[in-house]
Amino acid sequence: MDTILETDKLSKRFGDFEAVSGLNLRVRKGSICAFLGQNGAGKTTTLRMLLGMMRPSQGSGHILGLRIDDEAESVRIRERVAFVAEDKRLYDYMTVRQILRFTKSFFPGWRTDRESDLLRRLDLPLGCKIRKLSKGMRTKLALLLAFARGSEFFILDEPTEGLDPVATEMVLQIVVSLASDGATVFFSSHQIAEVEQIADHILMIHKGKLVLDSPLERIKDEYRQVQAVIHCPVQNCDFELDGVERVYVDGSTVSMIVSHNVDAVMDRAYKMNAVSVEVAPLTLKEIFLETVKASG
């Protein structure tokens, strides 16, 4: 399986605080990979290290075969990777038309056809000064400047922030079309529903550590809530099984979050004379919240 991004024990410390701890990330070529985590989990710090904008304290990484911790190679990474930062910084004194002309001059592979299509779909005013654009319009412009570069790899930090629902849906469709054309997209987001709609792989970090790394379909197929009603003393029940992530007890009811091995968990419940055992799927949001809780 070809990878476009990989890291080995990537870490970043700020004094005594370890913001990112030993990350081993892999992003497959042609995938849409979501990078999830709470505020302060280390997502933006990780993205900055990947792009050579911040040096790691330990560990290493490669994008497109180039070392992220080598100054010269990190410049080449930034030339080849289309990046949209969370703050969407742009040259406020320029008009939309001027920044388009300015940006395309740096990229020989600029997709003029995609630029024209996105200008129409995103309804950007060419003659307007950037400083007069709304937050949503600035986000649209930043995305257009990235999407039209003709890159094979896109790194997007909160790409739909500030967009209304119609514009959000349009941007998600564009991201899917990029992947359909052979590009790879690695994006961070707080919008779980959006992630569930377009991502095919999930990388989740919590307090700087990788806590989940799996294809989305496998997560949705295997994660379950198992609820058993057991009339024997619940405190004597042993559900320390492979795949049981969390156990909640409420009277005679035992609820478990199970990442895999559901059949074995059900068998254990029946061996404890459970009078009923129910299995229900979990949404990605529920899995995210439970993974965060389990990680402490």
Residue spans for each PLM region:
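ABC transporter nucleotide-binding domain
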Residues: 170-257
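ABC-family P-loop ATPase nucleotide-binding domains
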Residues: 79, 85-142
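Helix-to-loop junction immediately C-terminal to a conserved catalytic motif
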Residues: 51
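Walker A (P-loop) phosphate-binding loop of ABC-type ATPase nucleotide-binding domains
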Residues: 37-42
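Short, charged/small-residue-rich alpha-helical element at the C-terminal edge
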Residues: 225-296
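Conserved ABC transporter NBD signature motif
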Residues: 59-70, 76-77
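Catalytic Walker B motif of ABC-type/P-loop ATPase nucleotide-binding domains
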Residues: 154-158, 163
